[in-house]
Amino acid sequence: MSRPQFDPSAYAAQLEDKKSRLAGLLAPFAAPAPEIFESPREHYRLRAEFRLWRETGNEKRHYAMFEQGDKHTPILIEDFPIASRRINELMPRLKAAWADPALGFKLFQVEFLTTLAGDALITLCYHRPIDDAWRQAAEKLAAELGVNLVGRSRGKRIVVGRDYVEEELSVAGRRFRYRQPEGAFTQPNGEVNQKMLGWAYEALGQRDDDLLELYCGNGNFTLPLATRVRKVLATEISKSSVNAALANLADNAVDNVSLVRLSAEELTQALNEVRPFRRLADIDLKSYAFGNVFVDPPRAGMDPDTCELTRRFERILYISCNPETLAQNIAQLHDTHRISRCALFDQFPYTHHMESGVLLERR
């Protein structure tokens, strides 16, 4: 990852710029003014990734990051104020552990994953095979730091403790527990994610029909939204995310969700009866009374066929990490659906990136 520019004094102006940019992109569709959900100014990022950089002429190593497009000029990191307090507390303690050759030899990358609930997992990546000597040293370190550890080298992965962290998020007075796996996507800004879940929960409202969810990930939105509808059909293509979502549904006793490992494009084919899928053999698609669809697509947005699929629903709840592709998708749907609510979630302070949400309702 590249190092964001950290300047809390500039936060308000940067957020205003994002608000203006989103409002401008949605203006052709007569969107209401966006609701704004701010981020904490510091210690908001729950994960961080650092390369290790060795000083020329000695063995001293540092956490390092690079400006985008420049992989040769390191920015040496002693602390990282945008990262969670837990990450900042762990950084020097982990650095001291590099003195043990069993842990430090040919270590080239470190990844931290933490939660608002206080859990932490550290992944150590090596340019050498790791073995039982590494495991023994890692078990001691994990106990000292109170973390889970994962070691990675070519073709090998050793887990000390758990290979996931445990998160708790509160939505509308109910607490939901999440397993967030190492290496899988999770929302980086926990406080803003919690606000985003609350907005989506409120925007959907209480319904007596069913919800289709595309790109469900580890069930981040699935859990609270499932309490708003009769039942949910959710899709996700990543195997690790599917497994995490199934565990999260079970841990929270959410029993009205069916989850299938299909891409959005494949589900479109299934709903249009273009072709059958074995993974849908136990699911009766005709038993669903879909009135709502929730989408949280990748940066490329929805492909035209998937976008066309969403047109058949009364309500389209759309979370986007790219406002440009969001606007492109809305342009395709604008003749049948209007924007009734929109929001800006500042997941990524001090960068140009933004998360946004819209509720589209049939005209």
UniProtKB/Swiss-Prot annotation:
S-adenosyl-L-methionine binds at Q187, Y215, N220, E236, D296. One of its GO terms (molecular function) is rRNA binding. Keywords: Methyltransferase, S-adenosyl-L-methionine, Transferase, tRNA processing. One of its GO terms (biological process) is tRNA methylation. It catalyses: uridine(54) in tRNA + S-adenosyl-L-methionine = 5-methyluridine(54) in tRNA + S-adenosyl-L-homocysteine + H(+); uridine(341) in tmRNA + S-adenosyl-L-methionine = 5-methyluridine(341) in tmRNA + S-adenosyl-L-homocysteine + H(+). InterPro entries: MeTrfase_TrmA_AS, MeTrfase_TrmA_CS, SAM-dependent_MTases_sf, TrmA_MeTrfase, U5_MeTrfase_fam. One of its GO terms (cellular component) is cytosol. Its EC number is 2.1.1.-, 2.1.1.35. The active site is at C321, E355. The keyword Methyltransferase applies. It holds the Pfam family tRNA_U5-meth_tr. Belongs to the class I-like SAM-binding methyltransferase superfamily. RNA M5U methyltransferase family. TrmA subfamily. Dual-specificity methyltransferase that catalyzes the formation of 5-methyluridine at position 54 (m5U54) in all tRNAs, and that of position 341 (m5U341) in tmRNA (transfer-mRNA). This is tRNA/tmRNA (uracil-C(5))-methyltransferase. It comes from Pseudomonas aeruginosa (strain UCBPP-PA14).
